């Protein structure tokens, strides 16, 4: 491999975006574990993103995101847009709420448009029944944002007492999901290989 080829082989930067901002939540622990597994499986760079650090209003932008960054008027929107634009791909780690995914995650998605386009996405849900419904909804929305979603969407199941207590050891609780997660990260990595502009 020549030096120019090596320079082009840049390690993708992946944002692990947490879907929950509840005070008593499992999301940070699970997202950290998922990110660490992703690093082992793909050797990409993973950064955890907590939406509590990104207070985005529901309705303070006069323009539509599809019109581009020139319509952004709020500093928090500009900062969020810059954060997402600087990433090469995403992992969403989210609980399922009442058959769907959290409003905070929907708001974060809807604040932007072009910044999401064409980028690989891996969806990991969790809950008493695994969160398959919320994952399906996220996949649908991601399609409208022109993201490229890994086919396998791990749905991590948790017993009710773990959810209520807000304490979990993913390495113990999710052993049965390891095969599915490894498969999903394999598909996620292949999405970069199939995109000539974003090779690992």
From Swiss-Prot:
One of its GO terms (molecular function) is FMN binding. One of its GO terms (cellular component) is nucleus. This is NAD(P)H-dependent FMN reductase C4B3.06c. It is an enzyme of class 1 (oxidoreductase). Its EC number is 1.5.1.39. It catalyses: FMNH2 + NADP(+) = FMN + NADPH + 2 H(+); FMNH2 + NAD(+) = FMN + NADH + 2 H(+). It is found in: Cytoplasm; Nucleus. Homodimer. The keyword Transcription regulation does not apply. Pfam families: FMN_red. Gene3D superfamilies: 3.40.50.360. Keywords: Cytoplasm, Flavoprotein, FMN, NAD, NADP, Nucleus, Oxidoreductase. InterPro entries: Flavoprotein-like_sf, FMN_Rdtase-like_dom, NAD(P)H-dep_reductase. FMN binds at residues 22, 96-99, 126. It comes from Schizosaccharomyces pombe (strain 972 / ATCC 24843) (Fission yeast). Has several reductase activities that are NAD(P)H-dependent and involve FMN as a cofactor. May be involved in ferric iron assimilation. The keyword Oxidoreductase applies.
């Amino acid at each position: 491999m020549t030096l120019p080829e090596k320079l082009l082989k840049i390690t993708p930067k992946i944002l692990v975006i947490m879907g929950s901002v509840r005070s008593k939540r499992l999301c940070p622990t699970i997202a950290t574990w998922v990110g660490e597994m992703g690093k082992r499986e793909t050797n990409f760079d993973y950064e955890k993103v907590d939406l509590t650090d990104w207070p985005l209003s529901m309705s303070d932008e006069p323009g539509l995101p599809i019109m581009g960054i020139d319509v952004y008027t709020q500093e928090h929107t500009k900062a969020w847009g810059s954060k997402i634009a600087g990433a090469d791909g995403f992992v969403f780690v989210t609980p399922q709420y009442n058959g769907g995914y959290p409003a905070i995650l929907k708001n974060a998605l809807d604040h932007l448009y072009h910044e999401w386009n064409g980028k690989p996405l891996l969806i990991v849900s969790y809950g008493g029944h695994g969160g398959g419904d919320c994952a399906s909804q996220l996949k649908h929305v991601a399609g409208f944002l022109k993201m490229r979603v890994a086919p396998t969407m791990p749905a991590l199941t948790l017993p009710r007492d773990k959810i209520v207590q807000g304490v979990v050891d993913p390495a113990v609780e999710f052993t049965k999901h390891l095969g599915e997660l490894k498969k999903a990260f394999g598909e996620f990595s292949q999405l970069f290989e199939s995109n000539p502009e974003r090779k690992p």
